[in-house]
Design a protein with these regions (language model features):
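Secretory targeting and sorting signals
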Residues: 1-40
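Extended, solvent-exposed, non-transmembrane regions
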Residues: 37-379
Length: 379
């Protein structure tokens, strides 16, 4: 026997032991007796088929889930004429709650995980804690829903007759319309058509009219103002992106019965896009261009970096007014191109009386958000 024979014997014994160990699970699964273990060659292939069947099914489920993940996407968009928070210290406003008025809002949500995939709304007036004032005639909202099957829902333009709501506000004729469209499961609305669109407009708006004697409305907009939103897909070869647009159409503003006037030269607009490709998500914001004239008839310079500016009211030294141009106040864009979201406020007005804040007004707040899968939407 050569010096290498012992190693050869050990390898042979190991090979036999391995064959027996491999065969044992097959015998147990088939119920065969130990005497049937001799033909281990053919039986050794059985565990492969037995074990891999569930694994193959799990793989199919995983692939199916992965395919769904390549489709799921969502968007959120909103445009509003203004939001006014009036504190209970305001003269003439009774009740111990803060008044939160949301005037002229157009909004939408797209979420492929929901039963209603696309929801579009238009609302003339919303809010909470309305100081026990009856605003039921103004609280109108229009909603259009679409999905999961192919189809669309549209609420045509409706007109609201003016209803006085003193001492909080007055509104002229208001209108609204909304539409939502869906193209069916795992598909996208083609051809750049809007998935959602809505608008809300009102005329001759006055917030807290006559609340301070001799000064007219705290804030007035003479003319028609509006808020608009829309969403759509961005076709690109085989995979789509998503876009959301929010904008407002403002009228010139007057504060304290036009003691301070704000001329609107151009309106604000925000667009969010996401494609799922690196570097291809973005927020495009076009700020409003405003010109402000103070009580003495002189132009009022307002810092463009969002810093506040104080404006004195000589006719009533107890009144204080702070004006800001916040612009973009919250923005996030992912480097992988999957997410783009932002919020903005065109103009913020804080009014004090005797050092106490009585109103905080945000003019033309906008928000957009879009999120898509990596590489874009497979539809």
């Amino acid at each position: 026997m050569t010096p290498h024979a012992p190693a050869t014997v050990r390898r042979t014994a190991l090979a036999v032991s391995t064959a027996l160990i491999t065969a044992l699970p097959v015998l147990a699964a088939s119920g065969s007796s130990a005497g049937a273990a001799a033909p281990a060659g053919p039986a050794a292939t059985a565990p492969v088929a037995t074990v891999d069947v569930p694994a193959a099914r799990a793989g199919k489920k995983k692939n199916k889930k992965k395919g769904t993940q390549k489709y799921h996407h969502r968007a959120k968009v909103g445009a509003q004429v203004l939001r006014a928070i009036v504190l209970d210290q305001a003269p003439g406003v009774e009740g111990d709650k803060v008044v939160d008025l949301r005037i002229g809002r157009a909004a939408a949500n797209i979420n492929t995980r929901k039963a209603s995939k696309a929801v579009s709304t238009s609302k003339t007036l919303g809010g909470r804690g309305l100081a026990d004032t009856d605003l039921s005639g103004l609280l109108t909202g229009m909603v259009a829903k679409a999905g999961p099957e192919k189809g669309k829902e549209e609420v045509p333009s409706q007109t609201l007759v003016p209803v006085p709501a003193a001492p909080l506000l007055t509104l002229g004729v208001s209108t609204g319309e909304t539409k939502a469209r869906w193209n069916g499961p795992r598909t996208c609305v083609p051809g750049g058509k809007t998935v959602t669109s809505s608008s809300s407009s009102t005329a001759d708006l006055a917030v807290l009219p006559g609340v301070i004697p001799g000064f007219g409305a705290l804030l007035g907009l003479d003319g028609t103002v509006s808020a608009t939103q829309k969403t759509a897909y961005l076709p690109k070869k085989r995979k789509a992106g998503l876009k959301a647009v929010a904008t407002t159409g403002l009228a010139d503003l007057g504060l304290f019965g036009d003691m301070v006037s704000i001329e609107v030269v151009s309106d604000p607009k925000m667009v969010a896009t996401a494609t799922g490709r690196p570097g291809k998500a973005k927020i495009t914001y076009t700020p409003a261009v405003l010109e402000i004239t103070g009580p003495d008839g002189s132009p009022v310079p307002i810092p463009t970096d969002g810093a506040p500016a104080e404006i004195g009211i000589p006719a009533n030294p107890l009144l204080g007014l702070t004006i800001q141009f916040p612009g973009i106040i919250n923005e996030k864009v992912s480097e992988n191109g999957r997410l783009a979201k932002a919020k903005s406020v065109t103009l913020r007005l804080v009014v004090t009386l005797g050092g106490v804040t009585i109103a905080d007004v945000a003019v033309a707040p906008l928000q957009t958000k879009v999120k898509v899968p990596k590489g874009g939407i497979t539809c």
